[in-house]
Amino acid sequence: MYHPRELYPSLGTGYRLGPPQPGADSSFPPALAEGYRYPDLDTPKLDCFLSGIEAAPRTLAAPPPLPPLPPALGTEPSPPSAPEGLHSLPGVSLSLENRELWKEFNSVGTEMIITKAGRRMFPACRVSVTGLDPEARYLFLLDVVPVDGARYRWQGRRWEPSGKAEPRLPDRVYIHPDSPATGAHWMRQPVSFHRVKLTNSTLDPHGHLILHSMHKYQPRIHLVRAAQLCSQHWGGVASFRFPETTFISVTAYQNPRITQLKIAANPFAKGFRENGRNCKRERDARVKRKLRGPEPAATAGYGSGDAPGGPCDSTLGGDVRESDPEQAPVPGLPLPQLLPAVAPVLRPTCCTLPLSTGPPVTFQPGIPASRRLQTLPSALLSRLPGAAARASRLRIPSSSTLSILCLALPPRGPLPTALPWAWGLPRCGLQTNVLSLCSLPPGLLPPHFHYPFPHTK
């Protein structure tokens, strides 16, 4: 970079970049130079730029203190030893009503089922409280906390630690439905927490207590004195734990002895009893009823070419047994003589035969026979060989829709084409071969029946 006086010597040596200094070698008179002097530019000053910055650094103020929570709800769980409680409510005591039942389960190793939808605890926590102010209002709360930091597994007929516990889930507190209530209300009768439900769904929207499977937990019961549920001023809190209430959360019972105890002690465990709803005999009967299933409801006012659905709309499944050769139906027998022969090996369902007039009525297997059946019409019985002797055995619905039995044949059995009334009948598209006996020989039908029937293909 070149200085201007080097580029333009004609300007002389008095040319300066800065303001002229008084008394210096300058082409300006001293009085004029003093008038054009800028004292503020002699020494740079940055005070104007730093005037907003204080010398001492600022310190951020502390946030306002939050209202303290009850001390029992914020403490970490400790190993249970004896019924313990905080003494901020002096004179208050809590006793476990069903202590003997809990001790019986605890001696074996209590297990609690947890499901996605939530499962109630059994035994449930049932306590009695004394020492409350009859006029003051209290809240009863229950939460479940882990006992230790281990995960368990059932091995060798006992529970053993099998690693580190999973991260603790968000704590949830169950509030008794009667809360808040007066002390006289709580002391009048035992307080039961039988509605508490345990779940393993972390996204549970119903407020159930969320637990990990194969972890050991213990319920805690809190008694809070407060005017209302959302009050920030707590009048006192007392927490209680009982060592016999520890349990291991499972998705299925691991110890057979626990299953037996639950069956014997739980009045709602009828599903496991021999005479209960889920005993083998009842389960088999329910499965058979479901496999048969009710016939789909017929639509009213169908046309001449439309007909209600028949047994092809249902599925018999694999419950139909293969028939033995000696139990196979004898070809050539009339219908009244054939039905008793095939009853032991063939499973009856139903199909509908619409009549010429009248609205269709669906055959309902669940209705007692005394209310929905009547004997065959005399016009039909007179055309059946030997029908007079078996008229009381074969009955049909008392409606304008005639339900004839459909015979479920064994899966590998051929169609009995030797039967004259089975000619031209197709198989239904079921898992088993079903022969729809929806047509009878023309000589056996009364004149007022439709023939052929619309819903046969």
From Swiss-Prot:
An example of a Gene Ontology cellular component annotation for this protein is: chromatin
Read off the Gene3D superfamilies from this record. Transcription factor, T-box (2.60.40.820)
Please note every region of biased composition (Basic and acidic residues). 272-285
The record, for PROSITE patterns, names: TBOX_1, TBOX_2, TBOX_3
Q: Mind telling me which InterPro entries this protein's record contains?
A: p53-like_TF_DNA-bd_sf, T-box_DNA-bd, T-box_sf, TF_Brachyury, TF_T-box, TF_T-box_CS
Q: Which GO terms fall under biological process for this protein?
A: cell fate specification; positive regulation of DNA-templated transcription; regulation of transcription by RNA polymerase II
Q: Which GO terms describe its molecular function?
A: DNA-binding transcription factor activity, RNA polymerase II-specific; RNA polymerase II cis-regulatory region sequence-specific DNA binding
One Pfam family this chain carries? Answer: T-box
Query: Which residues, as ranges, make up the DNA-binding region of this protein?
Result: 101-274
Tell me yes or no: is Transcription regulation among this UniProt entry's keywords.
yes
Q: Which UniProt keyword terms apply here?
A: Developmental protein, DNA-binding, Nucleus, Transcription, Transcription regulation
Per UniProt, subcellular location reads as:
Nucleus
**Domain of life from the UniProt record:** Eukaryota
**Region described as Disordered: spans on this chain:** 1-31, 60-90, 272-334
Q: Does the keyword Nucleus apply?
A: yes
- Mark out the compositionally biased spans (Pro residues): 62-82
Q: What does this protein do?
A: T-box transcription factor that plays an essential role in the determination of the fate of axial stem cells: neural vs mesodermal. Acts in part by down-regulating, a specific enhancer (N1) of SOX2, to inhibit neural development. Seems to also play an essential role in left/right axis determination and acts through effects on Notch signaling around the node as well as through an effect on the morphology and motility of the nodal cilia.
Q: How does it assemble?
A: Forms a dimeric complex with DNA (in vitro).
Name of the protein in its database record: T-box transcription factor TBX6
Species for this entry = Bos taurus (Bovine)
